[in-house]
A protein has these predicted regions:
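Outer-membrane beta-barrel translocator/pore domains, especially the C-terminal barrels
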Residues: 1-222
């Protein structure tokens, strides 16, 4: 069976305990495995900090996983996260994947959210080395920054910019307007993308998403 939809694997703490870490339907993870991890935390009256670290072990290595996935050997890479919220308007989070042999970072993700609902600032930093996924891409280092504002109880706006730090270039701009009531949520998003590759050219996209809270959702993009 050809592998069309199970090539892109992102191993992290959210799927450490999953029975099948493959995406899609073309591959199924088999074999006997052991999962183990530790969760820790400190909780106070005004804030908290908590975290998780874990790893998996399989009795036999699995060559269905690529050598860059962190899952092909008996021991997997080490994955985890640390969250810190010293007060209500401030939240920091660090997510990681470390090489099982020398503990070098295969993936680093840092996020910070600061401010009340009236004006919340956000900053996200991501680093993926060339061996953190399918192995088809070189090292990636990106930063995304923006804000979100709850204008009224029903209306909110948000905007963000995503940049490639390796190439010192902007990848996209986003701006969104959201309306939410008891019956439905409507979100209008405008995205300007600057990616250029062969037949891919910079483009503008308007995306409308309508979610009925008891029925489902409708979405359209142009």
């Amino acid at each position: 069976i050809s592998n069309e939809d199970s090539q892109d694997i992102e191993f992290d703490e959210t799927n450490l305990f999953s029975r099948n870490r493959f995406t899609g339907l073309d591959r199924v993870e088999g074999g006997q495995r052991l999962y183990y991890g530790m969760r820790f935390g400190v909780f106070g009256t005004s804030g908290y900090s908590d975290g998780f670290i874990g790893q998996s072990y399989r009795l036999r290595s699995d060559n269905n996983f690529s050598t860059t996935s962190g899952l092909n050997d008996n021991f997997s890479d080490i994955v985890g996260r640390v969250s810190i919220q010293p007060s209500t308007p401030v939240k920091l989070q660090y997510r990681f994947r470390l090489d099982k042999n020398d503990f070098s970072p295969r993936r680093n993700e840092l996020s910070a959210n600061v401010g009340p609902q009236a004006l919340k600032l956000n900053l996200n930093y991501s680093f993926f080395d060339e061996g953190s996924g399918s192995g088809e891409f070189s090292d990636r280092e990106e930063i995304t920054y923006g804000f979100a504002s709850q204008i009224t109880p029903a209306w909110s706006i948000d905007a963000s910019t995503r940049r490639d730090l390796q190439a010192s270039s902007t990848l996209n701009h986003n701006i969104g307007l959201t309306y939410e009531c008891d019956c439905f949520t409507m979100k209008l998003t405008f995205t300007r993308t600057f990616t250029q590759d062969r037949d891919v050219r910079p483009s503008d996209t308007i995306f409308i998403r309508l979610i009925f809270k008891n029925l489902g959702e409708i979405q359209s993009g142009n």
